[in-house]
């Protein structure tokens, strides 16, 4: 059985997943609460586990999860890292932990640090893109220290 032909569906499937997360968020709250909720998520000093649904409401939390997931998908795509089963695991982790702790702001320093490391090693970022996304498990520390 040739499973590699199924890999072509991972990219559109993960994009659809992130769009569904954002649509769930948009349907769960009033639109006027969305931007203040996202602002609260981004500016709040996070501990390792901060429940964004409790802090900012389900609308902002699910939109944040969708945004972080789509950013992660684009990082994998732009790095030309192949989409495979591990990509699905990464997107699930990124989406899940975006409901408590990760946000569109605090993931960037870790991803940038990984990119700089790849440049320093003179290796393609695609070799480290998955590691960068998994390393964002420490993203709440960025918010805590900022």
Name each model feature, range by range:
Residues 1-102:
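N-terminal signal-anchor module of multipass membrane proteins
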Residues 64-72, 76, 88-122, 127, ...:
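Alpha-helical transmembrane segments in multi-pass membrane proteins
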């Amino acid at each position: 059985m040739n499973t590699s032909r199924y890999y072509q569906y991972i990219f559109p499937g993960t994009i659809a997943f992130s769009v569904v997360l954002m649509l769930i968020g948009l349907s769960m709250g009033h639109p006027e609460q969305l931007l203040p909720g996202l602002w609260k998520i981004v500016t709040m000093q996070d501990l390792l586990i901060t429940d964004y649904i409790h802090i900012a409401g389900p609308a902002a939390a699910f939109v944040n999860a969708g945004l972080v997931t789509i950013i992660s998908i684009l990082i994998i795509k732009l790095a030309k890292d192949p989409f495979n089963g591990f990509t699905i695991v990464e997107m699930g982790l990124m989406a899940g932990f975006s409901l408590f702790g990760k946000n569109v702001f605090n993931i960037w320093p870790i991803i940038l640090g990984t990119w700089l490391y790849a440049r320093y090693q003179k290796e393609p970022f695609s070799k480290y893109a998955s590691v960068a996304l998994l390393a964002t498990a420490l993203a709440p520390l960025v918010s805590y220290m900022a």
